[in-house]
Amino acid sequence: MKKPRVKDDRMIVTQLRSVLSGPTETVLARSRTRVRKWFATEAPWIQCGEMNSPLGPLFAAVNERGLCAIDFGRQQNKFLERFDPRARLEKNSQAVERILAQLREYFSGERSSFNLPVDISQLTPFQRSVLDVACRIAPGQVWTYQRIAEELGRPRASRPVGGALARNPIPIVIPCHRVIASDGSLGGYSGGSGPKAKQWLLRLEGAL
């Protein structure tokens, strides 16, 4: 009977350890770190509320920095899906009621702009810069995607501008509906019923 090849077996084990200690182990270590950080981070605090609007049910949410989300014409569960599942939700708070009160005034024609702290920190720097420019468009006016790109010093970026506006988490308050295509067509709109909602808002403001 042959003796076991101990030296050869040890070499195989050493080689396997070498393979496992490479990229695979690094990925696993990074994943464990992310999971630990996720559980260590305090669950976000979010206040949310809803109201009936001419565009359907409207939902608003506030975090510690300010208004962070508005959606309308959809179901509440779809609205809540955008938040961290660990979020601590509080409904119908005073902070949310202030937002809803201003929105009611807007829909009734008593208000054309908003005085609210907002939080768009989850967006990229480019997306935030696009929304900052959109906030400069006065009620009753419309700008084109091209003009916003030019205002940013990137005249060829009209398509990325449209993509950034589509990710606006706070429609109406940040008036992405005031941006249209260069040919005069409305272009897209991520809020509510899409272009129909955009058309309704522009008519409310006297732009159409």
Language model: regions and residue ranges:
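Basic nucleic-acid-binding alpha-helical/helix-turn surface characteristic of O6-alkylguanine DNA
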Residues: M1-R156, L204-L208
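Short glycine/serine-rich loop segments
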Residues: R156-W200
